[in-house]
Amino acid sequence: MDSDSTVTSLEENTENFCTNPTRDILAEGITNLFKPTIERLDERVASTIQLQAELRGQLDALAAQLRDIEKAQSQIPEFADKVKELLNVKHKVTVISNVLVTSQERLTGLHKLIEKEQRRRQALLDSALSTNIS
């Protein structure tokens, strides 16, 4: 092994890490760039979770009412099958709701990226036109 190693000590790396203003500014800029999007996404996820919990509660209440009706009218044998179908529908509604929410969030993000790209291209075009006119 070479005794003249170029590897720096942990203390030197820690010093460089702590006193790098360019890195700090860049990190702060990146954080500020993503923070609003992450906050909106977090709010939407929380809202969706709450709405799904409410829907699940309503479907559970309906299923309980149907079970009570089934007990009261036990002479209708196909009614139990309808309760099972309702529970299957409840599961499907939950899955579809999750897919739709995810798709909507992705489409919203894509739409924002498209608008941003259009503004950037328009600014470049305006800049090029003003340079050519001058």
From Swiss-Prot:
Source species: Drosophila melanogaster (Fruit fly)
Family: Belongs to the SNAPIN family.
Alphabetical UniProt keywords: Coiled coil, Cytoplasm, Membrane
Major subcellular location class: membrane
An example Gene Ontology biological process: synaptic vesicle transport
Cell compartment(s), UniProt: Membrane; Cytoplasm, Cytosol
InterPro entries in the cross-refs: Snapin (IPR017246), Snapin/Pallidin/Snn1 (IPR028119)
Pfam families according to UniProt: Snapin_Pallidin
GO CC terms: BLOC-1 complex; cytosol; membrane; secretory granule; synaptic vesicle
GO function term, MF aspect, one: SNARE binding
Record's protein name: SNAPIN protein homolog
Coiled-coil annotated spans: 50-124
Topology in membrane: Peripheral membrane protein
Function noted in UniProt: Component of the biogenesis of lysosome-related organelles complex-1 (BLOC-1) involved in pigment granule biogenesis. May participate in the coupling of lysosomes to microtubule plus-end-directed kinesin motor.
Subunit structure, as described in the record: Component of the biogenesis of lysosome-related organelles complex-1 (BLOC-1) composed of Blos1, Blos2, Blos3, Blos4, Dysb, Muted, Pldn and Snapin. Interacts with Blos2 and Dysb.
